[in-house]
A protein has these predicted regions:
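Short basic helix-loop element that most often maps to the first helix and adjoining turn
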Residues: 10-29, 54
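Short, charged recognition helix plus adjacent turn
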Residues: 2, 67-78
Length: 78
């Protein structure tokens, strides 16, 4: 999957663990299967925007916190 999906998935996992929430608990709150949430976290499938907002709400964070990806350093010519 894309680098963006992978990074968003990492953010979901990080915040879920900070909240001491299990995959099962997050899945139940957002009405998705445990398998689907696991795939989101592993970047195997993209998260649609509506689900991203539901996840952010379940984790009690701003959706922007899930969208943060470290900047990539481009090799620009001198």
């Amino acid at each position: 999957m894309s680098q963006i999906s992978t990074e968003i998935g990492k953010q979901i996992r990080t915040f879920r663990k900070k909240r001491k929430m299990t995959l099962e608990a997050l899945a139940a709150v957002i009405c998705k299967s445990k398998s689907t949430v696991s795939k989101y976290e592993n970047g195997e499938i993209p998260v649609d925007i509506e689900t991203l907002y539901e996840i952010a709400s379940a984790l009690q964070i701003h959706v922007e916190q899930l969208l943060y990806c470290p900047p990539r350093h481009a090799n620009l010519p001198d």
